[in-house]
């Protein structure tokens, strides 16, 4: 058995669940009476999605439907970074929603500092878009997981734990 144990802290989401969520949102928008004639389009790209609709009111309704469907499919709402809506031709409104994936250097440094300050028995290493936490005792790693979970709202990113060994 290894003398040290470790796990990775990552910020990721299941892309297929997002695709399924958007399918549900499109279906809901096309059948809902107040949104049926709004000609709403939702386009998913690699790092963002674009919502184009008729007015601010319908845009807000589509956002509400998106949040509700994402929550039901266990997607964190923190993956959505709603940008400012822009007016496009033909009295339509377009909103870009950036999808957060991976830990930025700034957030990784904050997370690393939080863990180092609170827990002395673990070591923290930033590895690209993830943070590896290593310790001799699995109890120390469990304490680190609890600490990171408690600080997740402060960091404003969805966090998952992988490669626990």
Curated annotation (Swiss-Prot):
GO cellular component, one term: cytosol
Pfam families: DUF520 (PF04461)
InterPro entries reported for this sequence: DUF520, UPF0234-like_C, UPF0234_N, YajQ-like_sf
One Gene Ontology molecular-function label: nucleotide binding
Keywords attached to this entry: Nucleotide-binding
Signal peptide positions on this chain: none
Family classification: Belongs to the YajQ family.
Job of this protein: Nucleotide-binding protein.
Protein name: Nucleotide-binding protein Syncc9902_1708
Species of the source: Synechococcus sp. (strain CC9902)
Lineage of origin: Bacteria, Bacillati, Cyanobacteriota, Cyanophyceae, Synechococcales
